[in-house]
A protein has these predicted regions:
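Bacterial Sec-dependent N-terminal signal peptides
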Residues: 1-30
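Sequence/structural signature of beta-propeller domains
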Residues: 27-348
């Protein structure tokens, strides 16, 4: 083969590789592969799964916001070590107490205490549980929320031992500054990213603005938008899961738009230390960058509708890439149509 042919061949090879790895889901030198969603109705009980947390190895805790008991469910999730695709999800046991369900939402595991923190929307508290499901005497010192639009998400920075949470919708005082095109307001929801130290003491908050809604909620049977989950990834990034859910009166045509945004923790931390620097002004929300987005829907021919509320880190794959695991809330497999979907997304 002559030199020119080698040059042409090399250029074609580079172009082929670029096409293979390039997509609208890749951004800022972070590669994303979506392995899609799967259901495991024969091995996982129907539920209202609103949070997921890794317990170590292949075991995970699931929060269920409508269970007849207070506690959590433990499942085992097996993944393909090369692709990160979910192979099986097996129900292990429910860890329940006689206490009333707190409308459990976000859930994280704290390795240094071997305890779980669980958000309860019903009582607007984030309290600590032991692995037997018993509530301990510790909880976050939260300001008041906004009813059912209160605290829903929870993330843990293991490097700095800092907990992050956020309301799903704006605080009452921030409502006039949200969903408006007027001066000094925002087209999306003005929320507060809040940080708490290892002693569960409040240490700072930062304004975060969601994307503007795309649907006309006045014609919806059910509508919800806002932040459904947070996740600390590595020592430099906070992932924010935004969700917009639209259900028409006919139910057919319902959809959920999901977006995962990256927020650099350097906006909140001083250098690599655990000292935070709080933004008191609402004029400059934290910067965010879209990592990945997808849409699920309910049509006459397609039943992919999935309201994703839980997100956590899975294992790292053999090539060093990171697995993100997500779980959806099916409202106990409502009407025999919705499913408890699990999804894996790969980043590096």
């Amino acid at each position: 083969m002559c030199k020119n042919n080698y040059t042409v061949f090399f250029k074609m090879l580079v172009l082929l590789l670029a096409i293979t790895f390039q997509s609208d889901k890749v951004m800022a030198q972070v590669f994303v592969r979506d392995n899609g969603q799967k259901q495991f109705k024969h091995t996982v009980s129907a539920g209202n799964y609103s949070g997921i947390a890794p317990l170590g190895g292949t075991f995970y805790a699931l929060a269920d916001d409508k269970a007849p008991w207070d506690g959590f469910r433990i499942v085992e999730i097996m993944l393909d070590s090369i692709s990160g695709a979910i192979q099986t999800v097996q129900d292990i046991k429910q860890v329940a107490t006689a206490n009333a369900n707190r409308d459990a939402e976000g859930i994280v595991y704290l390795p240094h205490t071997k305890k779980l923190m669980v958000v309860g929307e019903a009582d607007n508290r984030v309290v600590e549980y032991d692995l037997d499901g018993n509530i301990t005497a510790r909880e976050l010192e939260l300001p008041s929320g906004v009813g059912n639009g209160s605290y829903e998400s929870l993330a843990y920075d293991t490097c700095r031992q800092i907990l992050w949470t956020c309301t799903e919708e704006p605080f009452a005082n921030d409502v006039p500054l949200s969903y408006s095109n007027s001066e000094n307001a925002f087209p999306g929801a003005l929320l507060r990213l809040q940080a708490y130290d290892r002693f569960l003491k409040f240490i700072g908050q930062w304004p975060y603005v969601t994307d503007a809604p795309t649907a006309d909620k006045s014609v919806a049977r059910n509508y919800a938008s806002g932040v459904s989950e947070l996740l600390v990834c590595g020592d430099s990034t906070l992932l924010v899961l935004e969700r917009e859910c639209f259900v028409p009166h006919s139910k057919i045509g319902a959809w959920v738009k999901n977006k995962i945004y990256k927020v650099k923790l350097s906006q909140m931390y001083r250098g690599n230390h655990s000292v935070v620097q709080e933004k008191s002004s609402l004029d400059a929300p934290v910067e965010k960058e879209l990592l990945y987005s997808w849409k699920t829907s309910l049509t006459l021919l397609k039943r992919s509708f999935a309201n994703y509320e839980g997100m956590c880190l899975g294992p790292k794959l053999v090539d060093g890439s990171q697995v993100l695991l997500l779980v959806s809330d099916s409202q106990n497999q409502a009407h025999g149509v919705l499913r408890d979907w699990f999804r894996s997304i790969i980043i590096r």
